[in-house]
């Protein structure tokens, strides 16, 4: 069962990676693949059981225990994707100016808590929609990757 969860997580990881990469070409994946947001739900479907495999009791060395059960390449890969997710999120905030793209009164706008930050062209609107997906998918990759590696390498003694 752990291996099945791991494979499911790898499918989620590579799907998230593909979605993420598409946004660099100004593509809004949610426009072409409406179910793309299912990837957001998938991280919870996998990450919560991964926490059970790891043990739910609060631990001071939670991450050290997770990393101890995996090979060195897994630790480095997760750390690299985690660092990328932080940088990606900062870039997302910068590029979106803290706003969300929307259509209001037939106009493309960027708004923040109901306040219009500025009007957008249709092209800018499409890019802003892509930035939103990019902001989320950067985190999806980390959650799927951690789940995949933990499920694959966690010892058989783990309760699940």
What are these regions (language model features)?
Residues 77-100:
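Hydrophobic alpha-helical membrane-insertion segments
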């Amino acid at each position: 069962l752990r291996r099945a969860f791991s494979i499911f997580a790898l499918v989620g990881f590579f799907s998230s990676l593909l979605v993420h990469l598409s946004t660099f070409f100004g593509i809004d994946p949610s426009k072409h693949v409406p179910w793309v947001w299912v990837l957001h739900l998938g991280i919870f479907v996998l990450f919560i059981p991964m926490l059970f495999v790891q043990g739910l009791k609060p631990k001071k060395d939670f991450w050290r225990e997770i990393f101890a059960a995996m090979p060195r390449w897994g630790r480095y890969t997760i750390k690299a994707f985690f660092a990328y997710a932080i940088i990606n999120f900062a870039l997302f905030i910068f590029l979106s100016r803290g706003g969300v793209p929307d259509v209001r009164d037939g106009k493309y706008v960027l708004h923040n808590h109901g306040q219009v930050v500025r009007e957008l062209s249709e092209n800018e609107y499409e890019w802003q929609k892509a930035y939103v997906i990019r902001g989320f998918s950067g985190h999806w990759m980390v959650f799927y990757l951690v789940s995949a590696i933990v499920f694959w390498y966690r010892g058989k003694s783990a309760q699940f």
